[in-house]
C-alpha cells in the first residue's frame, strides 16, 4: 500500500539519493545486498512503501537513477549500497549536460527521457496503490534541473492525480559552483511552480552552517550535508512506513501545508542535531525538540523565517512520546510567537507522531514550514538572473540548443510573480479579508 517511487537525477540528486537509500535501508534492517537482517516485525510491515520484494526474499528499492553522464552513477554503483538497486534502473547518457539547462531539458535530456519514462512506468505498474513520486535534484546544474523538470512534467501528464514531491537543492548565496546557476535555477522554478505538488527547498550554504555551528564539524564534506538531507527525507515519509498514533502521508501534508496552489515551496529542518561526540550525554525532551525545531538556525535553506510569517507548518515527531505533550508544545510555540504566524489561518500547525524513532535516537522531529520568508531565496536568484540577462551574458549556450529569449523572460516574470504573491500574503491581515476575495478567484 501507498508506495512511493523515488527518482534521482544529475550529480547532486544521485549523491543525495545514494545517502537516502543508506538511511532507509538501515531503518528497515536491509543490508547492502538487499537481504533483511532486522530485529522487529515493524520494519517489514510496510517495507513496500520504498522496496519491492524480489525473488529469494531480496528487497529492491523503487528507485530510478538518471544522469546524462556515467560518472556519478558509477560511484553510486561502487558505493556502500550500490548493489541493492535494480541494474535496469540506471539510465544514463554519455555526453553530459555541461551545466546547461537547455541541454537537459530540450536536447540531450529529451533523447534520454523516453527510456527513463519506460522505467518509471515499470516501477509504477509494480505498485499496489501508488501514492506518488519523490524527485531528488539540484536546480543549479544541467541534468537535475533541466532533465529533472522535463521528467516531472512528463510524469505529471501520465499520472496527474499522484503526488509529486521534490527535494530541490537551490544555488546558495555564497557558494557557487557555476556562473549560469541563476539561469538554470530560474528556468527550473518556472517549471516547478506549475508541475510539482510539494518542493522541499534545500541549499548548501544553510547545510554548511548547520555543520559548522551545530554539529561542530570543521571541514564538512558533501557526505555530511547529504546526511542531513536524508534525515529529513526519511522523516517526511516515516508515517507511511511505520505505525503511528497520528499519521501523515504526502497528500495530507499537501492539504495542510498549501493554502494557495503556487505557494508550495517549503523550508525543512530536522532535530535533534547534536555534534557526534556530545550525543550520548543528553536525553531529549519534547520541549527541547520543539525549541530546536523552530530555531531559525535549524532551517536547511538560506532564508530566515523571522523575516516572514508562517502560512502553515507541519511537525512530524518520531519516538515514544505523549501526543498530549506534543500538542501542548506546538500550541505553546504558536501562542508565544503569534506574530510569526498569519492570523487569517487559525490552527495552522499540524503535527503527527510516529512510534519508531530513527536509528540511534530515542526521539526526533522533522519540520516542514511554508513561510513567506522563502521569497528571500527567490529574490536572490532573481537578482542574479536579471543582472546577467540584462547583458544577455551566456545566453548563446541556451539559444544554441534551440531556446528562445522569450522563455527566459517568462521564467523571470513567473519567479517575480511568485515573490510578490508571498509578499502579498505576508502583509495580509484578517481585517482586510474583503479586499482579497476578488483576487483569490483570479489566481
From Swiss-Prot:
It comes from the Eukaryota. Its cofactor is Mg(2+). It is found in: Cytoplasm, Cytoskeleton. One of its GO terms (cellular component) is microtubule. Its main location: cytoplasm. InterPro entries: Beta-tubulin_BS (IPR013838), Beta_tubulin (IPR002453), Tub_FtsZ_C (IPR008280), Tubulin (IPR000217), Tubulin/FtsZ-like_C (IPR037103), Tubulin/FtsZ_2-layer-sand-dom (IPR018316), Tubulin/FtsZ_GTPase_sf (IPR036525), Tubulin_C (IPR023123). Residues 429-443 have a biased composition (Acidic residues). GTP binds at residues 11, 69, 138, 142-144, 204, 226. The keyword Cytoplasm applies. Residues 423-443 are annotated as: Disordered. SMART domains: Tubulin, Tubulin_C. One of its GO terms (molecular function) is GTP binding. One of its GO terms (biological process) is microtubule-based process. The keyword Cytoplasm applies. Mg(2+) binds at residue 69. Keywords: Cytoplasm, Cytoskeleton, GTP-binding, Magnesium, Metal-binding, Microtubule, Nucleotide-binding. Belongs to the tubulin family. Tubulin is the major constituent of microtubules, a cylinder consisting of laterally associated linear protofilaments composed of alpha- and beta-tubulin heterodimers. Microtubules grow by the addition of GTP-tubulin dimers to the microtubule end, where a stabilizing cap forms. Below the cap, tubulin dimers are in GDP-bound state, owing to GTPase activity of alpha-tubulin. Dimer of alpha and beta chains. A typical microtubule is a hollow water-filled tube with an outer diameter of 25 nm and an inner diameter of 15 nM. Alpha-beta heterodimers associate head-to-tail to form protofilaments running lengthwise along the microtubule wall with the beta-tubulin subunit facing the microtubule plus end conferring a structural polarity. Microtubules usually have 13 protofilaments but different protofilament numbers can be found in some organisms and specialized cells. This is Tubulin beta chain.
